[in-house]
């Protein structure tokens, strides 16, 4: 996999695991894994649907974080190396 998003999960408290930032981190890890999966299995359409659902959920969480805590949003975007939301 091209991105190494590994994080020591034992050092994170239960409260932090429910945070928006951590949820976005977990969804990004799943996106990276599925992207790698599609390099071998290009016609796996049921997994593609799952990827679209994950991307939609991550987009909604990013929009929420953008509205509530912009500084944290910017830091997370830089840390994960993902694109931000489109400007309308």
UniProtKB/Swiss-Prot annotation:
Per UniProt, subcellular location reads as: Plastid, Chloroplast
Sorted keywords for this record are: Chloroplast, Plastid, Ribonucleoprotein, Ribosomal protein
UniProt xrefs under SUPFAM superfamilies? S15/NS1 RNA-binding domain
Molecular function via GO: structural constituent of ribosome
Tell me the domain of life.
Eukaryota
Tell me, which GO biological process terms does this entry list? translation
Instruction: Show which residues constitute the signal peptide.
Output: none
Q: Name one GO cellular component term.
A: ribosome
- Does the keyword NADP feature in the UniProt annotation? no
**What's this protein's family per the entry?**
Belongs to the universal ribosomal protein uS15 family.
User: What NCBIfam families would the database entry show?
Assistant: S15_bact
Query: Record's HAMAP family?
Result: Ribosomal_uS15_B
The protein, known as: Small ribosomal subunit protein uS15c
